[in-house]
């Protein structure tokens, strides 16, 4: 063999180069998704411990009348959606096990989503300029929030960010629809004819079990987040809203101290009405025309992780401006 040491060194260098390229390529793929072009640092995208679709989305939802929804108690929480003149309730005890429901309201495609780690329930119009998108659960998380994926392009979408963070549709936004994270009794009082997502999901799940109970009681998070704040307890609940790219949050602690069930707040010189229901732990925001705006009830840590620039409603300051 001629110049065998040189050949060996060349071969070793080639092997190391291939291994490095393979490692880089592997690092750019998470749970089968290419994140090499992600809008967020890839080291902040975590695997949640389940394969893609290991948490199965519901694609053929079945509903029952309120009279037949005996599996719901007054204080059970639901995601309530009133859209195109139709009211539907999605019990949290079902959403915890599926996180995504691809549904239709009078023919219009929407996707209802829930992230148990962030307490965030959001609904999206999935029939926009990108065509009809249907979603699944990627098994990945960013800031502890579920990363959805659309089955048409396999782009990854951040629920709270309302944006595709990687893939063909990277940077695209998805339009949220007002969603009430409230009790069944409160939702039914406003929408007595609301149908309810039934246990007949096509999957065998124990919908009465709350597997997140220990997590909800704990102060700990499952994964690191990009921004932290100790201003409020991590898992204290807040109402978060984005208006013309400006974010504001209404901590339930501040709403309790404020004491008013209905009051007007001003954002960018425009008045908005806040409705606060302490008994049902529910809040919503309406514009000057009385239209409900998309918002999200979410844990403080999650809202701040995505929106460190957020304005924060303070009860004491609001009292001084009355």
Residue ranges and their predicted role:
Residues 11-19:
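Bacterial N-terminal signal peptides
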Residues 6, 22-25:
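Short linear, low-complexity motifs centered on an aromatic residue
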Residues 2-11:
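Bacterial N-terminal signal peptides that target proteins for export
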Residues 24-322:
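Mid-to-C-terminal functional-domain signal that highlights helix-capping/loop sites
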